[in-house]
């Protein structure tokens, strides 16, 4: 009948009829409900409410689910319907009956996910969506049980379904049995139990043979003593949870009284799917629009702590945690839920989400919620066994501090919103997110199966008893929450993947979950729903943070002046050849203090110290403190604009420099003048709480921020380290850290204050590892304190050149420490030398934590922070300032006695970063970290180093750790690259092979008589003409040329003709060289153009000389000729040998020889590419970055006079070593002495002298680079050396394979490059910004390379069309991955079906996962096609 909206009575009658039907309650009881009774408290759950909404829609209503759920009572619904149009009677539509039930039909979207997910190539695949149930009973009749199983199978088509190629088909009689019997009654009890455990482990994780129609298996094991163990193995491709209950019920009836079974259901699942798709088409379109609009704002999966990458688990196994709420607890919880107008499922779901939020790095995440939706107008649907599941994406945004009542209502609103748009299910939403480059995942499931009846139906319990145990698995699912009614209570069960989470984590979370629910049974829901930190974790942290301070409050400089008075003749500073005693240093400091006081400096003033490294710098610092002021260290190379910013921000009153300028702002005082003034009698008395120094660090806004640290704060840290190290007067400490880096605070006041001597490198030795090594050996340095990169530089020197055996302690801080560094350090130092890795922040007085390292345990991903130092404390907090549980990542906060006063003259920033709460004062570091279960702190990088790429949260430190964990990688730096779509890139430093043993023997030099004199004649001829020409010459260049002419005037030289003859030149060549130089000097071309000139490029000149020609010829002879069918890959470093590239390289183009040219200058590379044959590949080294695909790829590397182009020759050698495959060879030609002709052109480029190789040193450098050298040939001026590479074992394939084992796909860098070493900033830390800019530039150039879109072969083009049809986008790159272009498992299935249709070739999903690129799949397809043709030919012959 039609229902007019103004007929409230008729509408109410109709609504109550529907509710009575949906709830299974008597109509009279439902009609007795008041209009304002909350129907959710009367048993109306989300599923039934959805069914009601669909019945309303069938009558023309436009009310959506959210409107009905907002006020779930009859009165509110009648008000809503009163505003609507007339509700018409729906057309009676029975589900169609299939005409041919033997034909395959499509999978539902959930079935597709389960089917594809079980594939071995999927993440957490290799497992089916499966349930295993165990029951313990007695006296079961095996024959009757087997008959019951077969009876039920025949009644339900989906229990006879087979699954092939992404489709399903009903079999009349599957070939495999559905019953298994094991009779172990004669076994010993312990033997039977062992066998049962093995059988249970197997069956609980088995993949049934669904491709042969085996979707369930019922088993009976007859145990000793008369017990029977009944088990059921069910693949959930064929049945949802309600179907499982139906299966159990029918098994019970079929066993006890098969005659009581009703007629088998006539409805076919294929009919239901077709009808449902048509019925929901309009709703699906609306839901799709809803989800697409929300996509950019959707959160991701819960960021739970993981023990490993999910991809690394190849054979997932699950384990169950379970707890049963008692009948009383269940009733109380149900009553409270009804009072608050929420469903019981929402209560459990909200509690689950609160626990996830507590253990997740983010409180915003997605849950996967199965909706068991078997509603249809045809009542027969309730009798059908099949999988009617729809998956919903539920957005959880859990807020701290809100009551549970508020939290659960918010959770339910979100759930109802998801249900309202269920017609576009979770799988489609996630697929769209991937297509749009914003991938999300939802691997945590919340499933509620709280029906009115128990999970195990009475019909089954009567026959076999209640459930004893259960276990389930679902592909790609990390954690599956399940709820069931059992007995009089509710069973809570979590199934999680074994090994995916850290040990003990699921148990701790589950304990918190159960505890929360039990509190909710009895406590007021108006209280905040915050979960407390587990008590054991609270106690452990209190103990670690409660260590008393070691310090006695005093000023930083007090101890030094006391020691100077006690032993004035003891060494304080060792600098170059100088020795400065304590007394001398104290006197200089007091003189400087006197001068400052005379200039008006008063306690608390800020005085800048901007001096080169050395004794005067140290004296100035102590002088400033002795005057009562605080020092502000500024590097002498500080940019003027930044210097002015700092001086103004700090309120600097005076600056101690190397110049006098009283009129400057602030005034500059010359340190030498201060040293000539009268000295103070003693330091000005100061309170320990006074400011000691202000160190400026970079600010995120671009404005430097000055950290103001008191004497007491710094001395607390220093005393903790002095107590640990037992520093004494016999120690000598190498002060490599800059004054404006706070590690220098310990050097100055810890070292000198404890009586040790400081060994000071000079300013020009700030980055000279060789100078440090010499100082360590010379002065028997015992203590090292630096950033890790500086120690890496020191260890890069061969042991023969760097003896560090005097070191007894090494302190490292300020950056990541490579995991292998302790192992490399140990054999280079004194026996018993301890490595201490420290961390913290400038804002917390140098350091706040310590980890002493002997050996590195295999489970460490990086060197951890360790424990807080005495007098200091650490917290790991979430975004609301709550302490997070162990293993959960949060922001590190530092407290205790070493905290800075704040930021100098910036109270607003100080208030933001230094916060107070009930536990005290804390500095918010902006660093990410976590506590381990034993109380160890782990540092995980900066908060701003956690980045998002295509929607995925990525911790750059984890990417770097994964790279560094691979053999052959020394260090790494990852970054997000700009330039269009953001992507992830990384630079790695290959580890050099151990020092190689080559031959240091030198062959006799081949004589080339008279070459030097001949060159001198030609040089004089050219220079004379140029100096006489009307050219404007640079004064320095003119002077150098005149000096050379004067030096060569006394030499006896041959005639011009004789000189030309000796060199094998024509006069035209001399003219060409002179004209080229004249053009450059006249400004017709830029000086850099000479590098392209065939006459002036230094390498080109060398190649034109007789000994150069001979060296080149011998080099080419040393290249082997590839055998037929083989390839020889040759890399050439540097394009600056212009002439020989044009001629010599062309001669290298033999069959089988592949030539690649590497060059750091784009201009030179482009010019070379234009000149050279197309067969020669050119590769740019933008900013020196070598693309990782070239690692370990080449059989030979050629370097023709190219080493001088590098800042240090070892960089060029490291590049060559990285390019060579194992047993590859470097062929190197280098100049041993100056060539006047070559210097003609070089002088225009650079006024620095050309670096020339000394042959013994060159051979030693090669050996140090891990290349075994052998000199093949030499003249007096040039040498040819061959060096054998043992090989790094590092190549692109090995890198990718290693990353696949350690990182999920979204975290793997799309581009990898390598460098000989990572660039450092002024503080000795890795210069991340510079590297990110370099990688972005290199990526931009790569994207514009002509080869980026290569023409496709015909067979590739045909395959690309199949890709395009599925992906709905152009496909042009043969190496592009199907998945990087937006593909997923479902689209892969469609693609393989399209390939089968077009090419007649059947490819398996595993084949596709092995070759997911266009080129790889095309090759595989060709092989398959050939095999099919050969098979067909063979059959035709037979």
From Swiss-Prot:
SMART domains: PKS_PP (SM00823). The keyword Phosphoprotein applies. Its EC number is 6.2.1.69. Gene3D superfamilies: 3.30.300.30, ACP-like, Chloramphenicol acetyltransferase-like domain, N-terminal domain of ligase-like, Nonribosomal peptide synthetase, condensation domain, Vaccinia Virus protein VP39. It catalyses: holo-[peptidyl-carrier protein] + L-cysteine + ATP = L-cysteinyl-[peptidyl-carrier protein] + AMP + diphosphate. One of its GO terms (biological process) is antibiotic biosynthetic process. It is an enzyme of class 6 (ligase). CDD domains: A_NRPS_TlmIV_like (cd12114), Cyc_NRPS (cd19535). Signal peptide: none annotated. Residues 6-85, 1350-1425 form the Carrier domain. It comes from the Bacteria. Its cofactor is pantetheine 4'-phosphate. Residues 563-950 are annotated as: Adenylation. Pathway: Siderophore biosynthesis; Antifungal biosynthesis. Induction: Expression of the pchEF operon is strictly dependent on the PchR regulator and is induced by extracellular pyochelin, the end product of the pathway. Repressed by Fur and iron. GO terms for molecular function: ligase activity; phosphopantetheine binding. InterPro entries: AA_adenyl_dom, ACP-like_sf, AMP-bd_C_sf, AMP-binding_CS, AMP-dep_synth/lig_dom, ANL_N_sf, CAT-like_dom_sf, Condensatn. Disruption phenotype: Deletion of the gene completely abolishes the formation of both Dha and pyochelin and results in salicylate accumulation. The modification O-(pantetheine 4'-phosphoryl)serine is found at residues 46, 1385. Modular protein that contains an aryl carrier protein (ArCP) domain which bears a phosphopantetheinyl arm to attach the activated salicylic acid, a condensation/cyclization domain involved in the cyclization of the cysteine, an adenylation domain which activates the cysteine residue into an aminoacyl-AMP ester and a peptidyl carrier protein (PCP1) domain which bears a phosphopantetheinyl arm to attach the activated cysteine. Belongs to the NRP synthetase family. This is Pyochelin synthetase PchE.
